[in-house]
Amino acid sequence: MRAKGFTLIELAIVIVIIGILVAIAVPRFVDLTDQANQANVDATAAAVRSAYAIATVQAKGIPTCDQVFANPEGGSTSGSTWTSSDNSTTVSCNASADTFTISRGGKTRTLNLTVN
């Protein structure tokens, strides 16, 4: 009667193949995560620019941080910092409301906005 099962060589080959697949997939996954974080920072920067433009018109001049963050969508404001509802993205505003720093997942972008 012949024993059923896998030989040690067959198991070793499968483990090597799985190791190669993991070595290829993990760096790509990390790169995709970085790209997603950068895309989120860029989208948030565009939203801050729009909010700043609206607040500038409403304030008839340079707006305050509170005016720029007046209607946070899906997040909360504490002082001069807006945080997304899942705590993954933050937007900080300086006292004169002309510099905004956006951060998410190690990616950061600074906006210097002025009123013309």
From Swiss-Prot:
InterPro entries: N_methyl_site, Pilin-like, T4P/T2SS_Core
Compartment(s) where it occurs, according to its Swiss-Prot or TrEMBL record: Cell inner membrane; Cell outer membrane; Periplasm
Keywords (A to Z) from UniProt: Cell inner membrane, Cell membrane, Cell outer membrane, Membrane, Methylation, Periplasm, Transmembrane, Transmembrane helix
Transmembrane helix keyword on record: yes
Phenotype when the gene is knocked out: Deletion mutants show a defect in twitching motility while DNA uptake seems not affected.
Disulfide bridge map: none
Topological category with respect to the lipid bilayer: Single-pass membrane protein
Span of the signal peptide: none
Matches recorded under PROSITE patterns: PROKAR_NTER_METHYL
Entry comment on modification after translation: Glycosylated.
Cleaved propeptide residues: 1-5
Annotated TM spans: 6-26
Modified residues (N-methylphenylalanine): F6
GO cellular component terms given for this protein: cell outer membrane; periplasmic space; plasma membrane
Domain of life from the UniProt record: Bacteria
Role played: Plays an essential role in forming the main structure of the narrow T4P pili that participates in twitching motility.
Name of protein: Type IV narrow pilus major component PilA5
Lineage: Bacteria, Thermotogati, Deinococcota, Deinococci, Thermales
